[in-house]
Structures are given as C-alpha cells and as structure tokens.
UniProtKB/Swiss-Prot annotation:
Superkingdom of the organism of origin: Eukaryota
Main location: mitochondrion
A cellular component term, taken from the record's GO annotations: mitochondrial matrix
Entry similarity comment: Belongs to the isocitrate and isopropylmalate dehydrogenases family.
Keyword Transit peptide appears in the UniProt entry: yes
Protein name according to UniProt: Isocitrate dehydrogenase [NAD] subunit beta, mitochondrial
Organism: Homo sapiens (Human)
Cross-referenced SMART domains: Iso_dh
NCBIfam families reported for this sequence: mito_nad_idh (TIGR00175)
GO BP field: isocitrate metabolic process; tricarboxylic acid cycle
Keywords carried by this UniProt record: Acetylation, Disease variant, Mitochondrion, Retinitis pigmentosa, Transit peptide, Tricarboxylic acid cycle
Summary of the function given for this chain in its UniProt record: Plays a structural role to facilitate the assembly and ensure the full activity of the enzyme catalyzing the decarboxylation of isocitrate (ICT) into alpha-ketoglutarate. The heterodimer composed of the alpha (IDH3A) and beta (IDH3B) subunits and the heterodimer composed of the alpha (IDH3A) and gamma (IDH3G) subunits, have considerable basal activity but the full activity of the heterotetramer (containing two subunits of IDH3A, one of IDH3B and one of IDH3G) requires the assembly and cooperative function of both heterodimers.
Disulfide bonds: none
Length: 385
C-alpha cells in the first residue's frame, strides 16, 4: 500500500508538472518521450499509475478487455481500478455512484465506456452519466476527428476538433408538465460557463498550433440563450488576435461538414449541438468505432470514445471495433506523460488499419474484435525501440 501511495503521488506530480489544470498538458517532445520510458521503468518497480475504469454498457466491457490486453502486452505501468455502473443492468445506485466518484477523485484520471440512458422516466431526470459529469465538473468534451491512413472514406485527410460544453444547455435535466399534455424543457446558458468553454477552445487552438476557431450556435432563433453563448465567444476571441474566429449557425454547420469539412479547424459549441456534431463528424472518417474522445475539468480527465454509443446489438458477438477506445487509451497515457507507451499503442493501431488485412465489420471487413486485438499486439511486438 505504501508503494501504491507513492505511485499515486508520482502520478499527480507528473500530471501537475505536465498539465497545470487537468486539460492544460497539450504538448509533447522527444525529451518527454525519453522521460516517459525512464519513468515507466521506475514505476514498474514500485507499482503502477492508478486509473479508474468504468466499462459501461453495451460493448463497453469488450472494449475495455481490449485495452487491458494491449496494455498487458505493452507492459504499460497502469493499474485499473474497475467499477460497474449501469442503469439497464440494475447495477446503478447512489452507493455505486459515490464509489465511482470517490475513485475518480482519488485517481484524477479515468477511462470509461458508454453508460446507457433508458428513455423511460422513472422519477429521476438526470442520468447517472450526466450526474457523473456534473459532479466532476467535466465541462469540456474534446473529440479529435482525424482520418486514418489506409482507410478510405468519402472525405480523406480530415483533421478537425470539436469542443463541446457539457455541463449545462439542454442537458440541465429541467423538465416539467406545466399543463396536461404540455411539457416545458429548460435550456440553461450562463455567462461563466460560456466564457470558460470559449477560453478552453482558444487555449486548445493556441497550444495545438491551430489557426481557427468556429463558434457554432442558433442565436438567430434563441436570441438570448445562444446569443449569450455567441457574445461570450466573441469577447474571448478578442484576447486571441492570432487565432482566426468565425461563427456559424448549427444547421448550416451540419451541411458544411458534409459538403466541405476541410474548412473547419476547431469548433466550439453548446451541449446538444456538440453531441450531434460529434456523431456526424465521426461518420466522415469511419464511424463511432474509430474516433477517440476525452472530457476535462480543471482537476480531472476522463477518456472515452468520441461518439458515445453502447452498440448493444453487438454484445457478445465479438464484432466491436476497439480502435476508438485504444486510441483514447493512448491519449490517456500521453496525459499521464507516458509518451513512450502512448506512441507505441497508437502506432500499432494505426499500422493495423493502414495494412488493411484486419478490419472489423463496421470498416468493411470480416475480422473479429479478438482478431483486431491480436493484430495490434503483434505490431507492438515487432515495433522497434
């Protein structure tokens, strides 16, 4: 236990040094790569970096199995603390939610699957997924939509980032029946949170060397709510004169993404729009199975798939695509300053796709999840030091 405690301290020290604020560590270097390898060797002696794992519903457990198998083969110095929370498998309760929150607050870093939200109203409007994000204040969801070399789609060589505010908006769980047959749903937009996500987007663009931020809105109709969001983005944009700033109405944005997605660089938007655009953009490069995502607060980082789908119809069929989850796991390792292991895993996944011999059904192939995992591990083993 003393050794594990020491590792927890080391984890936080490394994350703090590289990431002042959970979402700030956005750059890497050759020196960091070498340091990662050295740190990993030291940590293996004492223990491992503790990370909370929440498999979720649908194919989530199968995807997490893929992560664990690849991490084991790559000798990644991470210890997963696994918890289970599900509203559809009768595995959800206040006690379980608090256990998950406690683990995530202790470890600061988590990797999660999709927690499926039932459509039936059972007395609680806020899903466990939403409550988890609110309690950790995971205000920024980041989805990097990038084409995978070797996998041809209608649009190739895409590289854009979608940043979504995910603690308010239409996901505020404020609904009521004002009269029989009349439901009112409240959308909450605040200046503080709109400014915060706008600043996050411009900081991200600056640190990643990106040249443009597009604010997506519907201020022509929701003049006060989206008007406030747009105003905050415009105010923040003035503080970043080197970053080009544009605005676009959400419906036009959907059309432009399909017709000419190359015009976009970084997009920032309120909650519901981000959920829709995440999925639309994922479809441009191969679908939900290939796009990684992550969510940040000032203190915590959670890694997940970019398009959140439980894919329940595939459970137990060994056909789920682990690409998105493995790339997300690679991003998690980079966040922990384990650059060596992060690059090793990402390179192996991309090599499997580029070679093209092993592809799951969603990518037009006939390979199983197990086939894909074995192929990734095989490319790990043949990777040079």
């Amino acid at each position: 236990m003393a050794a594990l405690s020491g590792v927890r301290w080391l984890t936080r020290a490394l994350v703090s040094a590289g990431n002042p604020g959970a979402w700030r560590g956005l750059s890497t270097s050759a020196a960091a790569h070498a340091a990662s390898r050295s740190q990993a060797e030291d940590v293996r002696v004492e223990g491992s970096f503790p990370v909370t794992m929440l498999p979720g519903d649908g194919v989530g457990p199968e995807l997490m199995h893929a992560v664990k198998e690849v991490f084991k083969a790559a000798a990644v110095p991470v210890e997963f603390q696994e918890h289970h929370l599900s509203e559809v498998q009768n595995m959800a309760s206040e006690e379980k939610l608090e256990q998950v929150l406690s683990s995530m607050k202790e470890n600061k870093v988590a990797i999660i699957g999709k927690i499926h939200t039932p459509m039936e109203y059972k007395g609680e409007l806020a899903s466990y997924d939403m409550r988890l994000r609110r309690k950790l204040d995971l205000f920024a969801n980041v989805v990097h939509v990038k084409s995978l070399p070797g996998y041809m789609t209608r649009h190739n060589n895409l590289d854009l980032v979608i940043i979504r505010e995910q603690t308010e908006g239409e996901y505020s769980s404020l609904e009521h029946e004002s009269a029989r047959g009349v439901i009112e749903c409240l959308k909450i937009v605040t200046r503080a949170k709109s400014q915060r996500i706008a600043k996050f987007a411009f900081d991200y663009a600056t640190k990643k060397g990106r040249g443009k931020v597009t604010a997506v809105h519907k201020a022509n109709i929701m003049k006060l709510g989206d008007g406030l969001f747009l105003q905050c983005c415009e105010e923040v944009a003035e503080l970043y004169p080197k970053i080009k700033f544009e605005t676009m109405i959400i419906d036009n944005c959907c059309m432009q993404l399909v017709q000419n997605p190359y015009q976009f660089d970084v997009l920032v938007m309120p909650n519901l729009y981000g959920n829709i655009i995440d999925n639309l953009a994922a479809g441009l490069v191969g679908g939900a199975g290939v796009v990684p995502g992550e969510s940040y607060s000032a203190e915590y980082a959670v890694f997940e798939t970019g398009a959140r789908h439980p894919f329940a119809q595939a459970v137990g069929r060994n056909i789920a695509n682990p690409t998105a989850m493995l790339l997300s796991a690679s991003n998690m390792l980079r966040h922990l300053n384990l650059e060596y292991h992060s690059s090793m895993i990402a390179d192996a996944v991309k090599k499997v796709i580029k070679v093209g011999k092993v592809r799951t059904r969603d990518m037009g192939g006939y390979s199983t999840t197990t086939d894909f995992i074995k192929s990734v591990i095989g490319h790990l083993q043949t990777k040079g030091s």
